[in-house]
């Protein structure tokens, strides 16, 4: 319920932001265009954000005969979690990672990379998949997928505004009267938009990871399995960085973008792996 409310607030805020931008650059005509754009984006985010996320990650559906072991694990965990069995996808990369997406538990998908299947044993794979099913059970997946879509859209709109202003604005009188200020505002938006998208990701992601870890550990009854998997994923993902869209970084079980530097932990979409492992090791009794 709370996640559905947060999703509604997020979509409403995006609509309001687009209306303000449209009115500033092209008056009433800009507001009408922004309203149509917001309606398309809101509907698209709700119904197609999971498909967009799977497409952006390069995930492919995997049939039961291709990996019966994976299907058995997912089906067993879904039964324990009390949720429908999600669709299963495979991401062809050696970097170990995984994510879940969808509108609700009845329309959910989980995706795992080849790296996860290569480096993890069955208990560790169970831990990873239980974590992802934890996101499904906790209903994190809709807001997570919507944020991924909107983060990309925010950056795209900022670029459109910038290039539109650079090559003569949007044709409105306001744009013509404010050419200097409009160009400065468009440039500022180009800089601020990615930061705003990142802050949105940070606002909804860190606590969710702790909660999904705890839920996954309860599903399996084996927090050590997930703790070992996280340790392996952390080490191997540094050796084999994953090529992932920044707008999707918050969706993965492990931060796919290696930033490094003094601000890396501050602006990471995930809590430090060490802290996640320590919390799990302390959760051995259920």
Predicted regions, residues:
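Polar-ligand-bearing catalytic/cofactor-coordination segments
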Residues: 1-10, 28, 43-184, 195-286
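Short, hydrophobic transmembrane alpha-helix segments
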Residues: 19-29
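Hydrophobic alpha-helical transmembrane segments of integral membrane proteins
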Residues: 186, 190-191
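Hydrophobic core segments of alpha-helical transmembrane domains in multi-pass membrane proteins
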Residues: 30-40
């Amino acid at each position: 319920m709370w996640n559905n409310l947060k999703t509604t607030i997020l979509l409403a805020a995006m609509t309001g932001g687009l209306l303000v931008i449209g009115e500033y650059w092209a008056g009433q005509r800009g507001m009408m265009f922004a309203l149509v754009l917001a309606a398309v984006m809101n509907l698209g985010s709700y119904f197609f954000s999971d498909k967009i996320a799977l497409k952006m990650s390069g995930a492919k559906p995997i049939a039961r005969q291709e990996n019966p072991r994976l299907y058995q694990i997912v089906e067993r965990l879904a039964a324990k979690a009390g949720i429908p069995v999600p669709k299963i996808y495979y991401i062809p990369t050696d970097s170990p990672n995984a994510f879940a997406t969808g509108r609700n538990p009845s329309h959910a998908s989980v995706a795992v990379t080849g790296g996860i299947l290569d480096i993890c044993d069955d208990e560790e794979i169970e831990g990873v998949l239980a974590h992802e099913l934890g996101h499904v059970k906790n209903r994190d997946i809709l807001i997570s997928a919507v944020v991924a879509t909107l983060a990309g859209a925010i950056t795209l709109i900022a670029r459109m505004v910038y290039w539109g202003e650079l090559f003569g604005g949007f044709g409105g009188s306001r744009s013509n009267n404010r050419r200097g200020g409009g160009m400065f505002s468009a440039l500022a938006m180009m800089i601020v938009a990615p930061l705003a998208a990142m802050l949105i990701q940070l606002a909804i992601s860190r606590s969710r990871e702790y909660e999904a870890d705890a839920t996954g550990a309860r599903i399996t009854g084996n927090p050590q399995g997930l703790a070992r998997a996280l340790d392996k994923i952390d080490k191997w993902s540094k050796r084999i960085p994953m090529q992932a869209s920044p707008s999707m970084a918050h969706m993965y079980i492990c931060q796919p973008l290696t930033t490094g530097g003094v601000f890396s932990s501050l602006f990471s979409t995930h809590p430090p792996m060490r802290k996640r492992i320590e919390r799990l090791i302390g959760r051995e009794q259920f």
